């Protein structure tokens, strides 16, 4: 494919190897200098750049107000997200403190605030359940390794190691089984794996993955998370969150479920336990939900405009719930479940459980990529709203460093949330110091008023979580705008939603991305092509609709396909070229006056059909001289691969064999180098490759041959028409109506490509008739 001489010519303008090596060594020496290394390390800490320029007089009080407001909203939200993750409530507050504080040093966004996210918490919960069950099963199996299966399951033996009850717990109720094994491990002096251990290991591994994404500049991978994929995924995640919290709202204790399709089992467990609904819990949940609906939907717009300050209805609900539960003793008298003990001390740092990495690798990768996609999406919205630039590459490092450093404290995976990011800005927050004040306020909440949160009912948290999913469910409105115009995007949205709901969060997201990529591949296999024509006003060549082809002067067809010419689209390109030629010639033929329009006498229809058939046959014999000239504009190809280049050569050869002169327009330097480095010019005449479309059109017009004389055309038509007269007369005696229809269809098809001849030579019906009559008389005399 590549020729030795062509490669030499291609790289002949490059400097000698020694000069290149010396230049590289000099650049490496400069990059490894102490000053450059220090500058590179400091580039990972944007705070060094913006903090000395901080405007204390104009920004301090706004950031302080924004931080306190953010802390007020983060208290109930953090506790609620901890319940989704399946860890103690205080860890939700820790998650709102440490990542947000660390992001100040590494982030480039002034408004992004890191914290828990419902979808990530649910994905983390699934990984925790998987690891806890695996660990419990593995430990439990070691106690029975020396026993046979019959001994373990002996129904008649009262000392059987595994009873039917225990077996049912393993198969149907993971909750009791995991808890019993955990208690047994504590009894025997073995430190069991806690849920927070799994969560911290996940955020550590996810942070490492995000750092590597930053090193290799893989932020472009977030482009795979199209808006439709993320919308369907987030809405599907909202469905998972709803069924994860509905049990707490109803006061039903449901068994743990995890793995693909666990949502079906969760729904079945919910239906089976409807008889166990706790009425006091339902009343508290319903009243809490109605309070949020009334306050957030009806009172909030009026109060926000009146006080110019967002009212924290969630915090008001938490205070009311704690007060009512404490003084009415709801947990003691009516068995209403509450949050429980919250430590009032600063957690000591500890290492993650590295031995769990082999169990959570895939989960951590899915969580890492999802967190990056959500964070970059929020960053883009913030960029657009507040009109400043965010370094997306540095944001990958920021997420990674925050994850790795936060894993030394009891936290779970985090990302940005749009509501959390703008709530501080709504009251004046304008820099990253907003997160600093928020973290300090949350820390004071834990150390000072943490014990008061012990009386918060869990059903109130569940009501807050389910109400928060309302915004996600509003994304169903996107389908209405997608369906009329963007049907493929509509399908991607629905597939992402159904895969997330029906399968699982992590696996469903990966399959949704795969489906979106598949639709992209299919669309590259069916690229759009169009004709080009000259604009008389600008003298440039523009896209022309197929119905406007008859307005184009001349017989030079300009073809352009706007898509990569690669292995997925090469067959489509070949088909499109021939389709272009066919439509061009048919349109040019139909644009001239037909014989039916020249002679409307119905008595001459049979002769007209014979004459059109004769013209069609003559045109077919002469087509190698009068077919259109094709110009292929290669600037529509972003890039061309090996098969695409072979397709170009094959199309050129086939067009030449069919009598169609083919010309190419190439302006891109990369494509020119590709042509010269390969054997392209051994197949294609280099004189037929041009830099501009206008030059190619002029060259094509010079190749058009002069038409036949009128006498030659009429003589040929009359000769062929005489033969057709005899053949059609013989066939008509034995044909039925269907045969006549077939002949008429064939005649019509032939006339479509032959009427150009009559227009070019101004042939009339009378001339052809007289010539044919004289020809018949000569034949009769013979």
From Swiss-Prot:
Residues 728-742 have a biased composition (Acidic residues). The chain crosses the membrane at residues 30-52, 64-84, 86-106, 113-133, 196-216, 232-252, 274-294, 302-322, 359-379, 398-418, 433-453, 497-517. This is Sulfate permease family protein 3. The lineage of its organism: Eukaryota, Metazoa, Ecdysozoa, Nematoda, Chromadorea. It comes from the Eukaryota. Residues 728-782 are annotated as: Disordered. It is found in: Membrane. Keywords: Membrane, Transmembrane, Transmembrane helix, Transport. It holds the Pfam family Sulfate_transp. Belongs to the SLC26A/SulP transporter (TC 2.A.53) family. Its main location: membrane. It is a multi-pass membrane protein. Possible sulfate transporter. The gene is sulp-3. InterPro entries: S04_transporter_CS (IPR018045), SLC26A/SulP_dom (IPR011547), SLC26A/SulP_fam (IPR001902), STAS_dom (IPR002645), STAS_dom_sf (IPR036513). Residues 767-782 have a biased composition (Polar residues). One of its GO terms (molecular function) is secondary active sulfate transmembrane transporter activity. Residues 546-700 form the STAS domain. GO terms for cellular component: plasma membrane. The keyword Cell membrane does not apply. GO terms for biological process: chloride transmembrane transport; sulfate transmembrane transport.
């Amino acid at each position: 494919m590549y020729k030795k001489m062509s490669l030499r010519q291609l790289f002949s303008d490059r400097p000698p190897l020694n000069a290149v090596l010396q230049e590289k060594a000099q650049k490496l020496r400069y990059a490894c200098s102490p000053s450059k290394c220090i500058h590179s390390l400091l580039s990972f800490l944007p705070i060094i750049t913006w903090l000395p320029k901080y405007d204390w007089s104009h920004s301090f009080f706004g950031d302080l107000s924004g931080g306190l407001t953010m802390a007020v909203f983060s208290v109930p939200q953090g506790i609620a997200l901890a319940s989704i993750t399946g860890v103690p409530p205080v860890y939700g507050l820790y998650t709102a403190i440490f990542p947000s504080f660390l992001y100040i040093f590494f982030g480039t966004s002034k408004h992004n605030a890191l914290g828990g996210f419902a979808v990530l918490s649910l994905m983390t919960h699934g990984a925790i359940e998987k690891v806890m069950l695996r660990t419990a099963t593995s430990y439990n199996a070691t106690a029975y390794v020396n026993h046979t299966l019959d001994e373990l399951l002996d129904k008649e033996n009262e000392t059987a190691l595994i009873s039917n009850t225990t077996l049912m717990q393993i198969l149907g109720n993971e909750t009791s089984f995991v808890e019993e094994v955990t208690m047994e491990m504590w009894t025997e002096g073995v430190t069991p794996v806690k849920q927070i251990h799994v969560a911290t290991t996940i955020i550590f591994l996810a942070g490492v993955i995000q750092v590597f994404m930053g090193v290799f500049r893989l932020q472009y991978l977030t482009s795979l998370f199209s808006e439709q994929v993320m919308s369907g995924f987030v809405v599907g995640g909202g469905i998972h969150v709803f069924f994860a919290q509905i049990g707490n709202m109803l006061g039903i204790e449901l068994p743990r479920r995890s793995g693909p399709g666990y949502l079906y089992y969760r729904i079945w467990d919910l239906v089976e336990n409807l008889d166990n609904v706790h009425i006091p819990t339902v009343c508290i949940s319903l009243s809490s939900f109605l309070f949020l609906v009334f306050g957030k939907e009806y009172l909030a717009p009026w109060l926000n405009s009146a006080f110019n300050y967002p009212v924290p209805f969630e915090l008001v609900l938490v205070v009311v719930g704690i007060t009512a539960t404490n003084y009415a003793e709801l947990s003691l008298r009516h068995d209403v479940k509450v949050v429980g003990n919250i430590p009032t001390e600063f957690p000591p740092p500890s290492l993650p459980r590295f031995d769990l990495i082999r169990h959570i690798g895939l989960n951590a990768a899915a969580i890492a990529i999802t967190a990056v996609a959500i964070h970059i999406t929020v960053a883009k919205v913030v960029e657009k709203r507040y009109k400043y630039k965010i370094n997306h590459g540095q944001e990958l490092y920021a997420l990674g460093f925050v994850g790795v450093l936060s894993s030394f404290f009891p936290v779970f995976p985090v990302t940005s949330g749009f509501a959390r990011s703008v709530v501080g800005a709504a009251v004046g927050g304008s820099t990253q110091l907003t997160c600093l004040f928020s973290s300090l306020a949350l820390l004071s909440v834990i150390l000072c008023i943490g014990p008061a949160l012990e009386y918060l009912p869990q059903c109130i948290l569940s009501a807050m979580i389910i109400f928060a999913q309302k915004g996600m469910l509003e994304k169903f409105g996107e389908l209405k705008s997608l369906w009329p115009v963007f049907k493929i995007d509509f399908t991607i949205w629905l597939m992402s939603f159904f895969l997330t709901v029906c399968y699982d969060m992590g696996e469903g997201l990966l399959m949704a991305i795969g489906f979106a990529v598949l639709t992209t591949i299919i669309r590259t296999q069916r690229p759009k092509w169009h004709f080009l024509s000259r604009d008389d006003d600008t003298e440039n060549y523009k896209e022309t609709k197929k119905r406007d082809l008859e307005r184009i002067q001349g017989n030079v067809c300009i073809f352009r396909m706007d898509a990569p010419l690669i292995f997925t689209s090469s067959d489509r390109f070949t088909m499109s070229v021939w389709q272009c030629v066919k439509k061009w010639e048919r349109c040019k033929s139909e644009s001239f006056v037909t014989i039916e329009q020249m002679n409307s006498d119905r008595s001459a229809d049979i002769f007209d059909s014979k004459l059109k058939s004769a013209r069609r046959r003559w045109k077919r014999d002469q087509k190698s001289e009068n077919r259109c000239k094709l110009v292929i504009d290669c600037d529509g190809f972003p890039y061309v691969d090996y098969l695409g280049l072979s397709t170009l050569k094959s199309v050129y050869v086939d067009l030449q064999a069919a009598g169609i002169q083919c010309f190419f327009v190439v302006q891109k330097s990369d494509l020119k180098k590709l042509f010269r480095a390969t054997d392209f010019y051994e197949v294609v005449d280099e004189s037929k490759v041009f830099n501009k479309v206008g030059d190619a059109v002029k060259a094509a017009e010079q190749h058009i041959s002069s038409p036949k004389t009128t006498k030659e055309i009429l003589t040929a038509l009359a000769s062929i028409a005489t033969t057709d007269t005899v053949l059609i007369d013989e066939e008509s005696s034995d044909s039925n109506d269907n045969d006549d229809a077939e002949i008429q269809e064939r005649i019509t098809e032939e006339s479509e490509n032959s009427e150009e001849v009559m227009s070019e030579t101004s042939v009339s019906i009378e001339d052809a008739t007289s010539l044919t009559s004289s020809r018949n008389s000569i034949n009769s005399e013979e």
